[in-house]
Amino acid sequence: MNLEVKKIDTANSHLSAKPSIEDLKKRYDKIAQKIAQKVKIDGFRRGKVPLSLVKTRYQAQIEQDAQEEMFQEILKNALKELGIESKDLIGSPNLTKFEKKDTHFEIEADIGLKPTIVLDKIKECVPSVEVEAVDEEKVNERLKQLAKDYAKFIDTDAQRKAQNDDKLTIDFEGFIDNVPFEGGKTQNFSLILGSKQMLEDFEKALLGMQAGEEKEFSLTFPSDYHAKHLAGKEALFKVKLHQIQAREVLEINDELAKIVLANEENAALELLKERVKGQLFLENKVRLYNEELKEKLIENLDEKILFDLPKTIIEQEMDLLFRNALYSMQAEEVKSLQENQEKAKEKRESFRNDATKSVKITFIIDALAKEEKIGVHDNEVFQTLYYEALMTGQNPENLIEQYRRNNMLAAVKMAMIEDRVLTYFLDKNLSKEQQEILEKMRPNAQKTQVS
């Protein structure tokens, strides 16, 4: 066999081979015998099917298996010549040429290797971190909100007129052109006036009503209303108000602290203020990281940490980005790409820079996670998806199964690891005082969130 290998850089090698057709044919009998042991053909006992019949019926499979076996042998010899162990391979080799000639095959393939990454410049990559300080005014605002959120609603006298922040119990039905519309009728519906739970004009129409009162009013749905069949249309609503309850706002004192921090011993107002201040700091930190610093850190990692990337993995990522783009294209654009291969190649090529950066950052994050022993347990992935399902009104089990079926669980896990790695290094650049706030918050993270 004529085999040539070339090491392009630390992450890429190339092989060229010209195995003879005879070499391929020598493999036919052995492969046919394996197939004969497994298949069942009418008129023959299992394992007793004539080899000639197996070769005829399974010719395509035998040819394919023989080619795969031959290529694996070529790859094994190529790795041996290059001094590379199979554990250092990453992904599958990219077969760039496989042509059958009169007496031989012409085969070429790119081989991707796990990159060598030196992380000595990581400190240079982490931007300075200045999280906005939490002042007393912000703490007091949050305390007022907590006093409101934990307040109870109490019954009012029959003469009270509905006002903002009251809790109403109502029946209502909506009509368009005097015909009830789908989803427009509800009984014993609870609504806090001014909460924007319903359309603003709907809530305004209820102001001043009294318990037992009935009212009719018209409003126009916004043109961008989520229910398309109602968008921009005028509707008549008939409403009956059953009950008005007023919010009994709690005082900001130790009693409020005991309610909010119900699971903590010795809960008092000063402890609540400390928890609130810490929570506000965390919110400021997360917002700064997500809106600015994580992306800045990624850009610095991309710019300063240099190493060879396996071309095979970049090509796979380009394929993925191209396929994902096709899903969001109009049918006409997809058809245009199908009919014009050159245009399709250009479109795929347009993803090269994004694919290269994505692959590079993934390798860096993986290396940093291993060095710092940062990981994500499978249960944490499921918890994240469970929370996503609750927030979007989906069935958690169905959502998790959907991710599993589409092989997306690994991507979710990698995204969570990336977030933890970036947060870990940004937290290192916090001031000493802010790091102390973080340390105080961590033991209480699973207890109470005062937000």
Swiss-Prot record:
Q: Which InterPro entries match?
A: PPIase_dom_sf, PPIase_FKBP_dom, Trig_fac, Trigger_fac_C, Trigger_fac_C_sf, Trigger_fac_ribosome-bd_bac, Trigger_fac_ribosome-bd_sf, Trigger_fact/SurA_dom_sf
Alphabetic keyword roster = Cell cycle, Cell division, Chaperone, Cytoplasm, Isomerase, Rotamase
List localization entries: Cytoplasm
Alphabetized Pfam families for the sequence: FKBP_C, Trigger_C, Trigger_N
Instruction: Quote the catalytic activity from the record.
Output: [protein]-peptidylproline (omega=180) = [protein]-peptidylproline (omega=0)
**Homology family:** Belongs to the FKBP-type PPIase family. Tig subfamily.
Q: What is this protein called?
A: Trigger factor
Q: Which organism is it from?
A: Helicobacter acinonychis (strain Sheeba)
